[in-house]
């Protein structure tokens, strides 16, 4: 008995690049997404990355310029770690923002494939934890300098170096804002992974 092949007609509104017009190949996981939804996702990711870079830059700059008399950030390992962590987040967020902007135009950004989305998620997660670690240790030192520790005989120092303490406080606030934005980037990456896995399951 001869094989009978049943032709499948493509919809009348099938566009170029759609699952019905890709040369008979299986639909790709992310390229099948509506262009508008794809661009909105990458645009939101770009905005969050840019704001994260700005917050980290503000925290880094404020801490570096916080010196007042004998009070210097170089004398505290917690503040050194704070600057290193924010510098790493600033560099990463800037590069990630550029990648997101490129992905919005080319549809080949960091959230366009499952491996890249997983890598983005893991890096965001690790850097968010590192930034929280740096901010929390710097907050502890700042709190002791502002309030002192009577049981240990440590007196508050911010009365003598108020400008230093105010600038450190500003840097801490900016860093915590950067952490919130970085956590939001992690959520966006997790959302992209979910969407990619769902489309891959539908395609299979």
From Swiss-Prot:
Keywords: Cell membrane, Membrane, Transmembrane, Transmembrane helix. Pfam families: CASP_dom. One of its GO terms (cellular component) is plasma membrane. The keyword Transmembrane applies. Its main location: membrane. The keyword Membrane applies. The chain crosses the membrane at residues 44-64, 82-102, 115-135, 168-188. Residues 65-81, 136-167 are extracellular. It is found in: Cell membrane. InterPro entries: CASP/CASPL (IPR006459), CASP_dom (IPR006702). Signal peptide: none annotated. Residues 1-43, 103-114, 189-204 are cytoplasmic. It is a multi-pass membrane protein. It comes from the Eukaryota. Belongs to the Casparian strip membrane proteins (CASP) family. NCBIfam families: A_tha_TIGR01569. Homodimer and heterodimers. This is CASP-like protein 1U4.
């Amino acid at each position: 008995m001869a094989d009978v092949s049943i032709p499948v007609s493509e919809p009348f509104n099938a566009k170029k690049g759609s699952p019905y017009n890709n040369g008979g190949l299986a639909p790709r996981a992310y390229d099948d997404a509506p262009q508008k939804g794809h661009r909105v996702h990458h645009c939101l990711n770009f905005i969050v990355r840019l704001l994260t870079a700005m917050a980290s830059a503000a925290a880094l700059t404020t801490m570096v310029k916080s010196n007042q008399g004998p009070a210097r950030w170089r004398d505290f390992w917690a503040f050194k770690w704070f600057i290193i962590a924010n510098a790493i987040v600033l560099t990463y967020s800037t590069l990630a923002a550029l990648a997101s902007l490129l992905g919005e135009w080319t549809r080949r950004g960091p959230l366009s494939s499952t491996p890249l989305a997983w890598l983005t998620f893991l890096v965001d997660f690790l850097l968010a934890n590192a930034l929280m670690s740096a901010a929390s240790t710097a907050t502890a030192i700042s709190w002791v300098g502002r309030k002192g520790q009577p049981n240990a005989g440590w007196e508050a120092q911010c009365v003598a170096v108020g400008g230093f303490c105010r600038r450190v406080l500003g840097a801490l606030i900016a860093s915590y804002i950067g952490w919130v934005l970085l956590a939001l980037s992690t959520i966006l990456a997790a959302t992209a992974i979910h969407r990619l896995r769902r489309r891959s399951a539908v395609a299979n």
